[in-house]
Amino acid sequence: TLTYGFAKEAAVGTSAPGGHGYPESSSGPGALPPGLWARDVVCHPRGSSFRIEDACSERSESIDFELKLPGKHNVSNALAAAATCRLMSVPLGKVAEALRDFQGIRRRLDLIGETGGVQVVDDFAHNPQKIRSTLEAVKLGSTRVLAVFQPHGFAPTRLMKEELIEAFSQTLSPNDILYMLEIFYAGGTVKRDISSVDLVADLVKRGLRAVYVPKRELLLESLREGARPGDTILVMGARDDTLTDFCHEILASLQNTTLQTSQ
């Protein structure tokens, strides 16, 4: 096995987002334990840059990395890939070269398009940690986020309700707006005793601008009327392949609209 993570956290023996624990260093304060560690992390709207230090041997190696994917969670993913390659004796320089051209995968901060200064982004985020990471990444390049979330499944929504509320409460800014569609129902005899209305009600109590939207047609109208230059419309949800189609509908709708410059 090979330990990896962020140098700032490893040097003080703390944990990184996602729950990775790092051993205390035996070489004194600020020293790194054996592993791969990211330093000088800079996340920007179109990607990330950082340096990976290989502290697995006496002769440490340090390589600069650039990603075309924003967000600290993608830096963590790159570290995991580098650690895997390191175990297979692939040089870090080769890993950096490969990741520099990596465009990402479908429905992970997937930029559908931009019109009138408004971006439409599609993402698979569906649990609290992924929602938090995705929102943090999108906010790097946005003056405001218009987040659209479709919870997936009644049982998962029931189970994660409080954590979902916490994720949105801690990540959304006062000027951001959350539009919540009804829970995605894939059929079956599942107990349907919770609704997106319940989540929205609790979010509103916390002072968030959260809106329940029962139909996508109504949401298209709201986004047409409310979007302005500098906004990012972020559509999140899992298991429903039509969400990507809906992103394209949003983009087409905005292209036929004169966007407001203020609100």
Q: Can you say where each PLM-predicted feature lies in the sequence?
A:
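Active-site regions of enzymes building and remodeling cell-envelope glycoconjugates
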Residues: 1-3
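Short, acidic/turn-prone active-site loops that include or flank metal/cofactor-
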Residues: 5-9
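ATP-dependent carboxylate-amine ligase
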Residues: 10-13, 17-34, 46, 60, ...
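Acidic-glycine-rich active-site phosphate/pyrophosphate-binding loop
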Residues: 13, 40-61
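Conserved phosphate-binding catalytic cores of ATP/NTP-utilizing and phosphoryl-transfer enzymes
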Residues: 33-36, 74
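A short glycine-threonine-serine/GTX helix/turn-capping micro-motif
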Residues: 63-72
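Nucleotide/phosphate-binding loop and acidic/charged catalytic motifs
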Residues: 77
